[in-house]
């Protein structure tokens, strides 16, 4: 079912999605969290009146198919945290909604929306897509301020201690299967691909160490720590490694289609010794690569083994094990027919479990419960 053009023929609640992280090609941050919220809202707009609200440097009102997008301009940033914006005009959007779906729990905007919901009787739900900032949830639990928690993986529900809670649900994530699709006219060029923010917990340094010197590697994503970027450049010396910090969707799909494989080598403990319990809550770039019939390699970290079936749609390797990762990279290059079968199985897995229409279908059942 397309997210554009289909008319609604039944009454449905007005749903408001709130994305605290900055949003949009000029104001936004490259990453899976923003794409997740946008695509869920876009596909939901086919079934019910849907608005997506986020924040940016300038005020914008746009439409995407049947989705209304309101970017609130010039917000106040709590404690100068750029991903923790608040604005009074948010409350006018809350008044119009029957159901509110926040896409980050631990920011002040979401806590305010949840409190308004409790006072006004509106149903407010939350999906935690990672990140956060100063919030009252750092002092008191806001879990029950929300009607329900909609987790994007089993790991997410477990790590937040809600796996036995009746108000905590798993809706998973999806991919636009029309956009992210294989093209038989595009030849695989043997490039290994990483897509995501260049942050230490992504384990990109392990991938750089693992890549054979004669195998091309492309790293697509914005750097967020200058020290880490410089360390990656040092590790990449003498290898066929390229960095691409800006990439639109057309170029990204082409990169997925041409790649030997997509790798997401995230870690709990970074090369600097820092520890994260939630390095990945889903693994959106794995899903996008798999939708393009590209096999994937991930580490046995967080939610990623829920996506990649080891030996079927790709490989799951131990975290921070460059030797094991390098071995699987060489195997995929040496056995192209088997790699192709893995890619086909990967797309079938996404079609069976990780499409946006299936995610959208799960949400209204929970919204109305």
Regions found by a protein language model. Give the residues of each.
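A conserved mid-protein helix/loop that constitutes part of the nucleotide-sugar donor-binding site
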Residues: 35, 190, 197-212, 227-230
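Donor nucleotide-sugar binding/catalytic pocket of nucleotide-sugar-dependent glycosyltransferases
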Residues: 132-133, 144-181, 284
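Acidic donor-binding loop of glycosyltransferase active sites
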Residues: 257-279, 294
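Short hydrophobic beta-strand element within catalytic cores of glycosyltransferases
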Residues: 264, 286, 295-298, 308
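A short, well-ordered alpha-helix in the C-terminal region of glycosyltransferases
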Residues: 324, 331, 338-353, 362-365
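Short acidic/histidine- and often glycine-rich active-site loop of Leloir-type glycosyltransferases
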Residues: 272-273, 300-311, 315-316
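Conserved acidic donor-binding segment of nucleotide-sugar-dependent glycosyltransferases
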Residues: 310-311, 315-322, 331-336
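Nucleotide-activated donor-binding/catalytic signature segment of Leloir-type glycosyltransferases, i.e.
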Residues: 221, 229-254, 261
């Amino acid at each position: 079912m397309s997210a554009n053009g289909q008319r609604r023929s039944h009454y449905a609640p007005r749903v408001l999605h709130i994305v605290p992280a900055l949003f949009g090609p000029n104001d936004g941050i490259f990453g899976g969290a923003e794409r997740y919220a946008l695509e869920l809202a876009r596909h939901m707009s086919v079934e019910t009146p849907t608005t997506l609200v986020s924040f940016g440097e300038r005020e914008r009102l746009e439409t995407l198919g049947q989705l209304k997008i309101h970017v609130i301009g010039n917000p106040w940033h709590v404690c100068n945290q750029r991903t923790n914006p608040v604005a009074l005009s948010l409350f006018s959007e809350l008044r119009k909604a029957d159901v509110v779906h926040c896409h980050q729990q631990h920011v002040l905007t979401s806590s305010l929306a949840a409190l308004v919901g409790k006072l006004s009787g509106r149903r407010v739900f939350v999906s935690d897509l990672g990140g956060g900032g100063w919030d009252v949830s750092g002092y008191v639990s806001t879990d029950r301020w929300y009607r329900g928690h909609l987790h994007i993986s089993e790991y997410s529900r477990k790590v937040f201690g809600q796996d036995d809670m009746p108000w905590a649900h798993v809706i998973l994530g999806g991919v636009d299967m029309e956009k992210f699709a294989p093209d038989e006219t595009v030849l695989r060029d043997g490039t290994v691909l990483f897509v995501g923010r260049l942050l230490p917990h992504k384990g990109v340094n392990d991938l750089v160490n693992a890549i054979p010197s004669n195998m091309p590697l492309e790293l697509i994503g914005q750097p967020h720590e200058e020290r880490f970027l410089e360390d990656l450049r040092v590790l990449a010396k003498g290898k066929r490694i390229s960095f691409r910090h800006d990439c639109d969707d057309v170029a990204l799909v082409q990169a997925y289609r041409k790649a030997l494989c997509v790798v997401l080598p995230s870690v709990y403990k970074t090369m600097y010794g820092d520890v994260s319990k939630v390095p990945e809550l889903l693994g959106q770039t794995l899903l996008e690569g798999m939708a393009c019939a590209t096999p994937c390699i991930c580490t046995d970290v967080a939610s990623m083994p829920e996506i990649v079936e080891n030996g079927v749609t790709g490989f799951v390797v131990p975290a921070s094990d460059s030797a094991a990762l390098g071995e699987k990279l060489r195997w995929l290059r040496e056995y192209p027919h088997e790699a192709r079968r893995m890619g086909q199985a990967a797309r079938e897995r996404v079609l069976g479990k990780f499409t946006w229409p299936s995610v959208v279908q799960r949400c209204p059942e929970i919204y109305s419960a």
